[in-house]
Amino acid sequence: MDAAAVLLPFRPPECTLRRRRTSAGVPPRLRRALRRPLIFGDLLPTSFRSRGCDLYRRRGMHIRRNATGKLLCSQVKLEDDLDDETCELVSGVDLVIGEDQDSISAYLLKAVKNNNGTGVLLLSDVCGFEYPPTRDFAYQVACHGFNVLVPDLFRGNPWKKGWTVDRYEHWLSEQLSERVARDIDTCAKWMIDEFMAAGISKKLGIIGFCFGGGHLIKALARDEQAYFGTGICFYGANIDPSKGSNINVPVLFICGDNDPFCPVNTLHQIEKNIQSSKVVIYHGRGHGFAHQPESEEDDQAAEDAFAIMRNWLHDNLLVSKN
């Protein structure tokens, strides 16, 4: 691993298992301890399998770990029968990328059983990279074969629930676009360098929620090194449609039509400027529905959006490189 990356003990995500709600109430909490150190030299591309880890339909999980901390399919007790091939292993590692004041905290989730050798950079919303729904979503993406890096875009100071509007606006003004852009570019270059050293894919995917979705557009527009092969923007905030003319890769936009932070007309404007882009709008859905659903309708839309996203990554990163 690159000398500028420092390995740290991986902090287990406290994930809320997203599935369709039933009359029984809120889904059970799921704790996953992903402690196995990640070694990029172990990344050997395998054929993509669409029968990935279906987290939406698992029920009544009881988790145990073996001596190495790895989760095994045989150690997951389910109320319903589940094919072992549907349950994938994911390992994780906490990182510090860069040096001194320019260092960036991040975590990397790696698919172990079905790794396809492709990297994805995931940019969080204002809640930060350690927000449980964000970790849960990153885990799901990794479970489908990808290697997912989630950086701390806020340098240890994400938005906190309960802040006043004035406090939020002051905090947001401190998140300088130049610094965030530099951190994103540093993480992208780090991933490319690691993948090249391992002799595998040289193209990355990039996913962004809300704040991260807005910066995803900026990152793709300035991507002169062509690090990214595609982007997926979930309800991006403060999108500048004019940036689309500088984007040379397909972009998938996912949003609800009841989202004040991501107007549908803005997405259709930028769609016209990006070749092979696509806009998917979910009727009645608000902000954040895909990674932090709050109703049965949100859950159903989130499941559908995840499937569309997964297929988009497959078609634009895996099919295009073969």
List each model region and its residues.
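Short alpha-helix in the alpha/beta-hydrolase fold that links the catalytic acid
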Residues: 263-272
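Conserved beta-strand elements of the Class I
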Residues: 119-121, 205, 252
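Primarily recognizes the serine-hydrolase "nucleophile elbow" in alpha/beta-hydrolase
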Residues: 184-248
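Acidic catalytic loop of the alpha/beta-hydrolase fold
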Residues: 258-262, 287
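Serine-hydrolase catalytic machinery in alpha/beta-hydrolase-like enzymes
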Residues: 45-48, 62-199, 289-294
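C-terminal catalytic histidine-bearing segment of alpha/beta-hydrolase fold enzymes
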Residues: 276-322
